[in-house]
């Protein structure tokens, strides 16, 4: 049984190109060592086209042999260790990537993306669990909605074990290059199968990797070789375009550098990109405007719920200079009538979420204006999801959401199913603890959709979730999509000198 599983995994490695045929005996022996087995007999390889099932079987063997505890985190640590034995060394990966890059950047990234899935760094079986649908908004177009189920939730054993582990500062964070090949521990994921491509960005050492959770096609992360904090300045725009010029089929964007409106990791400078067209990228300029001193740069306010200024030019240097002017102006801009305050009590509030891309030979830079001011009424942020939408989304609106992809919490999968069942029975939503938070919203959905039945209920709820997400994006917009909001937006643009 064990030998058949090991043989199947080795054959998988050869079939996918992770290892060469002549590596068969060597790899088999490494796997035997990992499973504390000194013997081997040639058995028929277990038939399994499903890598996850094969690895589950090997984890079962490890549990039986007392090598690991039977918990989700222990199993993840162990199966990553096994896949690390099949994953090519970083130098081999880099060499192949560079050779393919000479043929075309797209060929290189296609190969690397496949490698990251084949070696199980991207756990395809888990990514496939994510729920995805499209909400067609009448104003803003096709909005992507996802309920994220691929991020593993800590099991109780792992939580208990993590409390006993001595605090470690290595690697300094989840993004650091020191994660490449790292064995992991109960409170830090294993990364033996993790690879990142060294690249030069703005004359500095950076790395290209893929997100293990792939929220969209070829979801990549570009991170600094040094553990330095996020910062939005002129060099940010230069780095974004430096990357896009090297990989013109990818967009690249940065989270904002302030809390509330920033991403989950502000301590390590990094960007996110990929081979995907978001709703925001498809959005048209609602009105064109002129930036003083940059009359040759096409500029306009985007038809989008978040307040976005789009800049276009064939020369990225012009966009870098123009964006720097906009950023400096926005950092110090106050408009009390529009409730825009550059700072309060010495705390800065204004920043930008920038996204760079190349479209048919023309470079684009979208500048989403952000502000993280809080008030007594909105302690989590005025331009943050408001309380009435927290039953769907209360987390920060980061780069991915700004572009039009909702990453919603996993709890919604079960909550929406329960909600559908209760609503179809005309039950009392407020009396069911797990979905009571949705009661007011559910009542409104019922009023808006008297036609709701078993056949259409799921679709209706999905579309209504999409509507809520657009409302959340509107909350994040510092200038609302109203005549008054657009007037205030124009006032800012005209102030840029």
Model feature map: region roles:
Residues 235, 244-267, 273-334:
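Catalytic or ion-translocation cores adjacent to nucleophile or general acid/base/metal-coordination motifs
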